[in-house]
């Protein structure tokens, strides 16, 4: 469930599972499950490591897919006999590149500001992008200054303090069912 939730919520996740040795995969038994087939519908990508010299590339691609475009879950299946094999020296699977911060074009910001100021009853629906962008403080200041109510998704729960007068809590929480009416 956690992997499927991460994928549907757009949260980057790399799940690594253990597996029987490759020499036992052809034998029908209670210890072997085709995990790559199981994870296929709930991940962006799933791969089994069958040779130690491919570990670096498989791990690198798992993280790349998990973090790219719409983030989500990926899966790596590791048979026990392959996990025990030495990985070639110098294999460094992850080279994290820090992307330069991107900002919206001034015209886009001005257009958005115009729409907000012209709106009769604006409301902000805050999602996981606020969390990933580390923008909770800025969102709270923006909403408070402009007196705009904020509803957050489950993945952004708490990005605006619940005691803030403009917090309309989390959409989908039964105790506070007024979010759907506001939207």
Residue ranges and their predicted role:
Residues 1-183:
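N-terminal alpha/beta PP-like core and its mobile active-site loop of ThDP/TPP-dependent enzymes
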